[in-house]
Amino acid sequence: MRKIEFFDTSLRDGEQTPGVSFSISEKVTIAKQLEKWRISVIEAGFSAASPDSFEAVKQIADSLNDTAVTALARCVISDIDKAVEAVKGAKYPQIHVFIATSPIHMKYKLKISPEEVLKNIDKCVRYARERVEVVEFSPEDATRTELNFLLEAVQTAVDAGATYINIPDTVGYTTPEEYGKIFKFLIDNTKSDREIIFSPHCHDDLGMAVANSLAAIKAGAGRVEGTVNGIGERAGNAALEEIAVALHIRKDFYQAQSPLKLSETAATAELISQFSGIAIPKNKAIVGANAFAHESGIHQDGVLKNAETYEIITPELVGIKHNSLPLGKLSGRHAFSEKLTELNIAYDDESLAILFEKFKKLADKKKEITDADIHALFTGETVKNLAGFILDNVQIDGHKALVQLKNQEEEIYVSQGEGSGSVDAIFKAIDKVFNHQLKLISYSVDAVTDGIDAQATTLVSVENLSTGTIFNAKGVDYDVLKGSAIAYMNANVLVQKENLQGKVEQISAHDGI
């Protein structure tokens, strides 16, 4: 049975989700969990986009033991140089080169002829192949590319040394039957004396990303690209956890399997949710809270008699656990540090001391501590470090609020606000500290775990009216009002960072496949 390589681009394409911005430490933690999940290749980022993007790719490449690491590069020599430098510390370094091939992209975005595109493919793939052993090539907007020219572009890349050919459905345009035919045509007609592996990369604009990816596998693709929880710009990308479980459950049909350790699926999905600030929908396939819930009495009766009557997937298969951790108020620092290691949470002596102190405070308030609680503690700490501000105090008096913030220079800001309710008053007080032009797009509070004593994660989404950029921010605390203040403070800090730095670092927020 064929084993399909799984290529995760949560840290590159997934981060293009509006409002999502992972810190470097969060990216490294995610990469380590992806390795634990046994992802074949991690696309760690677009290393030429900014110094932070380069550093994130480099740190991930240096941190992993067995997982291949790749960086995205346009068909531009300087991009490739940056990518090569960033991934050189990886045990298995790869480079992913792309250029658009559809008529609309060549005419309006690239403003060059098809002949020039082919010359660029040959030059850049050859240049990359001289520097790393494994090169992947993607013809951007492949599904709107004339089929014979697509074959010509693919053949040019293969002749120049590409081992992997990725066929992106960049705008989520294709259908399963059509996509499968494209793969069969390319696989049958691409000439090479070595093995060439094709892969799908699907966006979910028409809700068919997973179906299209599976159709490509059925047609002969040996690698599949996607993101955890399907995160990504617009409607998102193909959800890798859905593809993996579909291959597992229907291996009789696809005659293929994933390399993933499926029992790490839930933990991986939860980590991405925590760090991205995007809650997993309750009805989400595979990892949603309702994926194994049965409301109908007939269904409940059947499941109690034999789970296979209505469940084709067991919670245990994907690592959904209902037991709490053997950690509590009497647990010591050593046991706590071992749990952090088990959860792939990076720490040093200083951060361990801070996290352990927060853990002990939580254990005094909460009887049962879960993995999600530990992730929430870490998320709250990394967000605070990213922000450079801490919330010293918040006081509520009816519709009035007083907040006290402190920055890294130990400067203290005290502000009062009055609003239609407690949260509105807190936000207005924080607005006076930062004085940004913001629009609050969404505000939500989610319990980290079940129970009346659960920690809460507060999520806010704001628009910087000066630039139109959307930012997601989160605050984690046992107190919902305090968590709300932290989240809104963090959102303001992200806006402040953008206003100070501008967008000069970024090549393009949407320049990718």
Curated annotation (Swiss-Prot):
E.C. number: 2.3.3.13
Keywords associated with the record: Amino-acid biosynthesis, Branched-chain amino acid biosynthesis, Cytoplasm, Leucine biosynthesis, Manganese, Metal-binding, Transferase
Region (Regulatory domain): 390-513
Result of altering residue 297 to V: In strain: IL1403
Organism superkingdom: Bacteria
Keyword Glycoprotein: no
Entries under InterPro entries matching the protein: 2-IPM_HCS-like, 2-isopropylmalate_synth_dimer, AIPM/Hcit_synth_CS, Aldolase_TIM, LeuA/HCS_post-cat, LeuA_allosteric_dom_sf, LeuA_bact_synth, PYR_CT
Consequence of substituting residue 23 to C: In strain: IL1403
Cofactor(s) the protein requires to work: Mn(2+)
MF-aspect GO terms: 2-isopropylmalate synthase activity; acetyl-CoA C-acetyltransferase activity; manganese ion binding
Catalytic activity: 3-methyl-2-oxobutanoate + acetyl-CoA + H2O = (2S)-2-isopropylmalate + CoA + H(+)
Top-level enzyme category: transferase
Keyword Calcium found: no
Cellular localization per UniProt: Cytoplasm
Pyruvate carboxyltransferase domain: residues covered: 4-266
SMART domains linked: LeuA_dimer
Biological or metabolic pathway of the protein: Amino-acid biosynthesis; L-leucine biosynthesis; L-leucine from 3-methyl-2-oxobutanoate: step 1/4
Effect of residue 38 to G: In strain: IL1403
Pfam families recorded: HCS_D2, HMGL-like, LeuA_dimer
Binding site for Mn(2+): 13, 201, 203, 237
Function text: Catalyzes the condensation of the acetyl group of acetyl-CoA with 3-methyl-2-oxobutanoate (2-ketoisovalerate) to form 3-carboxy-3-hydroxy-4-methylpentanoate (2-isopropylmalate).
Family the entry assigns: Belongs to the alpha-IPM synthase/homocitrate synthase family. LeuA type 1 subfamily.
Subunit details: Homodimer.
HAMAP family: LeuA_type1 (MF_01025)
Name used for this protein in its record: 2-isopropylmalate synthase
